């Protein structure tokens, strides 16, 4: 009895115990409390049950909805100023960042951020960032790239909301180019293969069949293609510069969190965009002021698109923090499909057969691009075993 028993010995002892007299049973039971039975060492502990993260699901939901709302009200604001030929696209883009900056200022004044309420969580504190002048200078490249990517995106979607979404889905192509040429970080061979299919998908979406001759010709909005590629390029620079920024000693602590970093980037983006707006569209500013006072579509479109842009980007950042970059990248690709279908319904403009096929190819391989390296790694590890 002084030697601890294993599981088999324990079962045998219990069966013998049942056949003993009551007095001996009491003695044996007391002894078993003094010398408890040991569980076999090779029995694994039960795995904890996976918990359903309702807040994460809500963040994803509002991220998608916020992006769709942004696209809808961005289109409304651009139509109110005359569309892509109205001469006020840069003004709309800049004032959207102005709305973002005002909202960021309100968050700092109130010292809390209500975005977590969308995930049924308590609001988090958002104190002013304790950045130095040197930190602001270091953040300027990120702010510039963010401003350029946003403005180019507005020009792209203002030219063609549907084809613009397809072009923006090809962002990994420009990202691979930028990271290879400027940062010495080329993609893997598997990713390079995916890039060819992404380009092919966008190219096929640009084709239109002549009903008389049956010959395919390239037909697309050049403005949407050019500004979409510019936007993708600056988005790639922004991502790489942001990574460089965050490894600077002590900067993350002085920023005070991801929310502060994003807010500061939007404020810098607005301040950088403002002189560009004045230099390029100053002649049309009197016209814009009249429209802003009298046109409700412009008023609502500007405010809602600016707020939606801020909120959905912040939600995207929060999902990356909770899930990791790969999962968020796949979700971002799926979001393209959601927004593409949504904008087709809102604008009443149907996708052509070529656009449907091309978009499906491009988006599918963008999703594969996001996970291909991890899939290859798992396959190699399996073969080694």
Predicted segments with their positions:
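Polytopic endomembrane small-metabolite transporters, centered on the Drug/Metabolite Transporter
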Residues: 5-10, 15-385
């Amino acid at each position: 009895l002084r030697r601890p028993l294993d599981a088999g010995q324990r079962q045998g002892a219990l069966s013998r115990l049942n056949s003993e007299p009551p007095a001996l049973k009491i003695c044996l039971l007391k002894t078993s409390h003094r010398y408890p039975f040991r569980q076999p060492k090779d029995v694994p502990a039960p795995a904890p049950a996976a918990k359903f993260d309702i807040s994460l699901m809500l963040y994803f939901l509002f991220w998608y909805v916020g992006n769709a709302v942004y696209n809808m009200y961005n289109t409304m604001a651009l139509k109110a100023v005359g569309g892509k030929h109205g001469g006020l696209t840069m003004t709309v883009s800049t004032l959207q960042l102005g709305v973002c900056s005002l909202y960021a200022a309100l968050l700092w004044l109130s010292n809390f951020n209500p975005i977590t309420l969308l995930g049924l969580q308590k609001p988090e504190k958002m104190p002013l960032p304790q950045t130095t002048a040197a930190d602001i200078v270091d953040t300027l490249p990120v702010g510039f790239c963010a401003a350029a990517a946003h403005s180019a995106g507005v020009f792209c979607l203002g030219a063609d909301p549907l084809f613009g979404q397809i072009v923006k889905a090809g962002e990994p192509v420009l990202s691979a180019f930028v990271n290879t040429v400027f940062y010495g970080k080329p993609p893997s061979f598997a990713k390079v293969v995916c890039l060819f299919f992404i380009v092919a998908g966008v190219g096929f979406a640009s084709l239109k069949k002549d009903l008389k001759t049956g010959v395919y010709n390239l037909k697309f909005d050049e403005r949407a293609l050019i500004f979409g590629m510019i936007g993708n390029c600056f988005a790639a620079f922004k991502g790489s510069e942001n990574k460089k920024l965050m490894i600077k000693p002590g900067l993350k602590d002085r920023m005070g969190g991801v929310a502060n970093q994003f807010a500061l980037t939007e404020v810098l983006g607005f301040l950088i965009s403002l002189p560009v707006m004045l230099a390029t569209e100053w002649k049309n500013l009197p016209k814009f002021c009249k429209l802003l006072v009298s046109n409700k579509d412009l008023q609502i479109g500007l405010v809602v698109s600016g707020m939606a842009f801020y909120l959905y980007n912040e939600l995207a950042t929060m999902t990356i923090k909770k899930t990791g970059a790969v999962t968020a990248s796949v979700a971002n690709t799926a979001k393209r499909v959601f927004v593409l279908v949504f904008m087709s319904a809102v604008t009443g403009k149907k996708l052509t057969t070529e656009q449907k096929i091309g978009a499906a190819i491009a988006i599918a391989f963008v999703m594969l691009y996001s996970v291909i390296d991890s899939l290859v790694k798992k396959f190699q590890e399996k073969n080694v075993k």
